[in-house]
From Swiss-Prot:
Gene3D superfamilies in UniProt: Nucleoside Triphosphate Pyrophosphohydrolase (3.90.79.10)
InterPro entries, per database record: NUDIX_hydrolase-like_dom_sf, NUDIX_hydrolase_CS, NUDIX_hydrolase_dom, RppH
EC number of the protein: 3.6.1.-
GO biological process, one term: mRNA catabolic process
GO terms assigned for molecular function: mRNA 5'-diphosphatase activity
The protein's name: RNA pyrophosphohydrolase
GO cellular component: cytoplasm
Family classification: Belongs to the Nudix hydrolase family. RppH subfamily.
Keyword hit for Glycoprotein: no
Coiled-coil residues: none
Length: 161
């Protein structure tokens, strides 16, 4: 076990983006992951394609994950945030090449309506979605991402209220 832990720590982080998508009521889009039986809710996120800027990646990922790009960027995080996935998940994610993700986060105002959202995309990541209040967000998020989400909420909170 010690060797696998060391191996885990030697792996790099995958570069990506995360999106805190707000509706008109300042509720946040969360989706329930399709690839687990756990109640794993999260905000949309994804990788950065080589040559792509983080802001372009965020809008592309928004379209890929919620089926709509109706929105605009309010703010970009001041730093990169990272999280490690549990070591048991590493072989199942990203071909086992990464220990977790290092992400630039974006606060996005969704300008569409609920009917514009379609999670049944060509490569769906969610089987359910809903709008969550800022107060409930941290309680429903998958635990290994909670510390990152706390930091993102702290950075963007003054822009939401």
């Amino acid at each position: 076990m010690r060797n696998s832990s060391k191996k885990h720590l030697d792996l790099p982080y995958r570069l990506g983006v995360g999106m805190m998508i707000l509706n008109a009521d300042n509720h946040i889009f969360v989706g329930k992951r399709i690839d687990t039986k756990l109640s794993a809710w999260q905000m949309p996120q994804g990788g950065i394609v080589p040559g792509e800027t983080p802001s372009i990646a965020a809008m592309r990922e928004m379209l890929e994950e919620i089926g709509s790009d109706k929105g605009y960027i309010i703010a970009e995080s001041k730093c990169w945030y990272s999280y490690d996935v549990p070591s048991l998940l590493i072989p199942k994610l990203w071909n086992g090449n990464f220990r977790g993700q290092k992400q630039r986060w974006f606060l996005i105002r969704f300008t569409g309506n609920n009917e514009d959202i379609n999670i049944n995309t060509s490569n769906p990541e969610f089987d359910q979605w809903r709008w969550a209040s800022l107060d409930e967000l941290l309680s429903i998020i998958i635990p290994f991402k909670r510390k990152l989400y706390q930091a993102v909420v702290k950075e963007f909170k003054s822009l939401i209220q």
